[in-house]
Amino acid sequence: MSEGVELGNARPPRVAYRSKISGISDRLAHERPRTQQPEAQRPQGLFVTGTDTGVGKTVLSAALLAAMAAAGEPVRAHKPVVTGLGEESGIGESETWPPDHVLLGNAAGMTGEEVAPLRYGPAVSPHLAAQLAGERIEPARLLTAARSAAAGDDILIVEGVGGLLVPLAVDYTVRDLAVALELPLLIAARPGLGTINHTLLTLAAARAAGLDVLAVVLTPWPQRPNAMERSNRDTIAHLGEIEVAGLGQVRSPTAAGLASAGDALPWRRWLALPKRLISSACVPRRSEPVRNLRKSSVNIL
């Protein structure tokens, strides 16, 4: 079985980002000031987002959970909203949860209900799934559920829904929840064609909101990457000034198989990284086009 590998050892400098993508949405053009939580209320853990749906967020989250649990760490998984109920799981659970949600719950030793507070049938974006059910998702409910999941000393792994700008509610995105929780971010991305643009856009959107991005994780990372995959890895690391790691193909969705892959990732170091102090001055007030994600768009502290 292929295992995760750390692809980049160089640690990027501590930086304050002032660039943002022009025209993604009005919300990117007018960022809210970041509200700092008291230290006692900040959960310990990681927020896993992705460049798209189906890019390996769940496998990455499950591998991290299994590796931490195997190392004796108390862990909890949290998924703000699950859609697509009714799909066959095929992983030994009688409930008709989506297969990836079953995998996430099993890795944390939790039931599907414990992992996800909100659940809907159609496999569509959360805000639409709620509308189709005649409901409205309230941001306060999402935040309360996430903070409740983080109660105690457990390490919390939050898996986002789709990409960073997917609306959880009509006016509330995955990014908004990540900002409110103040968890460091991991970005799951494909290693193949198209990933450079998708990953750098996600990275820019995260940094524009003041999120602390620890690394990009390419998944599944092949045992023998081709020239394009190696170039994609190096280009993302260079242009994004970001650590890039790789999670190998998990061939067996067992706790042992997931733990083996996850333990090859530097999760201990990621969790031990001190939170970067991000002041309101680092959050852009006006939209500015991104000409370069390297030195021209950062201020070295």
Identify the meaning behind each predicted range:
Residues 204-286, 290-301:
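C-terminal lobe/tail of nucleotide-utilizing enzymes
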Residues 45, 59-136, 140, 145-148:
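N-terminal phosphate/diphosphate-binding loop that engages ATP/GTP or pyrophosphate donors
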Residues 7, 32, 37-38, 42, ...:
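Cationic, low-complexity basic patches in intrinsically disordered or flexible, solvent-exposed regions
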Residues 54, 155, 160-246:
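Conserved catalytic-core segment of NTP-binding enzymes
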Residues 48-49:
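Hydrophobic anchor at the beta1->P-loop junction of P-loop NTPases
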